[in-house]
UniProtKB/Swiss-Prot annotation:
Species of origin: Macaca fascicularis (Crab-eating macaque)
An example Gene Ontology CC term for this record: nucleus
UniProt record similarity statement: Belongs to the GPRASP family.
The protein's name in its UniProt record: G protein-coupled receptor associated sorting protein 3
Keyword hit for Nucleus: yes
Xref: InterPro entries: ARM-like, ARM-rpt_dom, ARM-type_fold, GASP1-3
Summary of subunit composition and partner proteins: Homodimer.
Principal location class: cytoplasm
Localization per Swiss-Prot or TrEMBL: Cytoplasm; Nucleus
Residues annotated as transmembrane: none
Gene3D superfamilies, per database record: Leucine-rich Repeat Variant (1.25.10.10)
Keyword flag Cytoplasm: yes
Start and end residues of each stretch annotated as Disordered: 1-53
Length: 547
């Protein structure tokens, strides 16, 4: 042990002189402040991205710091320093044994690990890495740093870029720290922001207690105890004693027998005795349990004391007086219509509906409204009334039709040529001439119709030909069409430019006239007229064959 101590002291003395010179040079450059200069240099090197320069600067700082600390701690821990220096001496001697190789490999790994830790801590924690007055470093670390600084000449020759395994290890360390910090920053099981509202239960209706027909659904005092309310209504108060599936509107005695626990709320308009708040008004909401006698008594109290209509949370306001209420009850005895009974319950304040509905009923008057509904006949009765009306006589109806046909003929010929009004009139006349009864009226306007045929456009000619085709089926009207002017106008339509429909109608008119002559329905007495007629027929036949 004594030899080891002497050897350590000798080595310290030999290295004292260059260390002192390095320290003096560093003090001159930094003007007595070593740590800020070293830190500034290291930061500048880190910004340039050169890792080797940063290591060199840190080594200079470490030398100045370690040499001062070795002097103070050499005496306190000679064993640790001696052991570290002994290891260093054995490795610096370049012995060719297996133990020496193992120690060199360990020192190399420790060297790079220590340098990385020093650089990283200095780079990320600027102030903490450059603080030379820190007392956090342990004594064994001081000895190890001394060994590392003295090993610099030997290790500098073997210093090579770090392998991929070391870089991967560093990335793994940084990655683990990053993701662990990320996991701790977020809640893996976040709570939902919105509150899930569970649906309220629906009360099931007891089918045994339901009325069989609407005759049992009444609200006068001698009626059955219960009447059906809104089916499937979602109750606003699930904890109430009686389910809201039925409404009690019988007398007080029957109400006590059927539902003894049901009592009506009778506070004033400005007070509320019920513990539950008023729900949102709907047109078809939960009915209130109320009897006819209780409603009548409340109306009398209001009339005597001058209290405004009641404002119980479970019912609407009742604006009727005693006389109107008794009339309403008498009207309800005469009908079982569910609509009328529902209107009556709204007027009595039994149904908590939308204020607009009750305001409308109160303004119109519930008695007036129900009386008008009762006096309004059903659709079946109105239909029977229409059917049993005496129809007009045949002569009257025929006279009206004749007046209509004459009016249409005058209007048609008076309209401008090819005007929409004229074409509409021709269309109506074509529908009216399907019956032979009105042909004698239209025959009086043949001259105007043939003028339209010869001077009108294609659509006008088509409507006139349809009308004349209907007239040609009647022998009496066809006889009036056999004259030179009419036949000449009919012959003009047979040309290449005429529409096919018009040609077909013209051919049909000639065929009908020919058939009437052949059958003897039309007799031609004048031979000149007959010869002229036959010449026109032969000419038309030749044109048709040519086309």
């Amino acid at each position: 042990m004594t030899g080891t101590k002497n050897k350590t002291r000798a080595q310290a003395k030999t290295e004292k002189k260059p260390v002192t010179q390095a320290k003096a040079g560093a003090e001159r450059e930094a003007t007595g402040v070593v740590r800020p200069v070293a830190k500034t240099r290291a930061k500048a090197k880190a910004k340039t991205g050169s890792k080797t320069d940063a290591v060199a600067e840190m080594k200079a700082v470490s030398k100045n710091k370690v040499v001062a600390e070795v002097k103070e701690g050499a005496l306190s821990e000679p064993k640790t320093l001696g052991r570290a220096m002994g290891d260093f001496s054995s490795k610096a001697g370049n012995e060719s044994t297996s133990s020496t190789c193992e120690n060199e490999a360990g020192i190399d790994a420790w060297f790079w690990a220590g340098e990385e830790a020093t650089i990283n801590s200095w780079f990320w924690n600027g102030e903490e890495a450059g603080n030379s007055s820190s007392t956090k470093n342990d004594k064994p670390e001081i000895g190890a740093q001394v060994c590392a600084e003295e090993l610099e000449p030997a290790a500098g020759a073997d210093c090579k870029p770090r392998s991929g395994a070391e870089e991967e290890e560093e990335e793994n360390v940084i990655g683990n720290w990053f993701w662990e910090g990320d996991d701790t920053s977020f809640d893996p099981n976040p709570k939902p922001v919105s509150r899930i509202v569970k649906p309220q239960p629906l009360y099931e209706i007891n089918e045994k207690n339901r009325p069989k027909d609407w005759s049992e659904v009444t609200i006068w005092p001698n009626a059955p105890a219960v009447t059906p309310a809104v089916l499937g209504f979602r109750s606003q108060a699930p904890s109430e004693a009686s389910p809201p599936s039925y409404i009690v509107l019988a007398s007080a005695e029957e109400n006590a027998c059927s539902l003894p626990g049901a009592t009506a709320c009778r506070p004033s308009r400005n007070t509320r005795s019920c513990s539950q708040p008023i729900p949102e008004c709907r047109f078809d909401s939960d009915p209130c349990i109320q009897t006819i006698d209780e409603i009548r008594r409340q109306i009398r109290i209001r009339e005597v004391n001058g209290i405004k209509p009641f404002a119980c949370p479970c019912k609407m306001e009742c604006y009727m007086d005693s006389e109107e209420f008794e009339k309403l009850v008498n009207l309800l005895k005469s009908t079982t219509d569910p609509l009328i009974h529902k209107i009556a319950r709204i007027a009595m304040g039994v149904h908590n509906v939308h204020p607009f509905a009750q305001e409308f009923i109160n303004e119109v008057g519930v008695v007036t409204l129900i009386e008008s509904l009762l006096s309004f006949p059903s659709p079946e009765m109105r239909k029977k009334t229409v059917i049993t009306l005496n129809p007009p006589s045949g002569d009257e109806r025929q006279r009206k039709i004749e007046l209509h046909v004459k009016h249409m003929c005058k209007e048609t010929v008076s309209f401008p040529l090819n005007s929409p009004g004229q074409q509409s009139g021709l269309k109506i006349l074509g529908q009216l001439t399907t019956d032979f009864v009105h042909h004698y009226i239209v025959a009086n306007y043949f001259s105007e119709l043939f003028h339209l045929l010869s001077s009108g456009n294609c659509k006008t000619r088509n409507l006139v030909l349809k009308l004349l085709l209907n007239m040609s089926e009647n022998p009496t009207a066809a006889r009036d069409m056999i004259n030179m002017k009419a036949l000449a106008a009919l012959k003009l339509i047979f040309n290449q430019k005429e529409a096919k429909a018009n040609l077909v109608s013209g051919v049909a008119i000639f065929i009908n006239i020919k058939e009437h002559i052949r059958k003897g329905s039309i007799v031609v007495v004048d031979h000149l007229s007959y010869n002229t007629l036959m010449a026109i027929f032969r000419e038309v036949k030749g044109i048709i064959e040519t086309m």
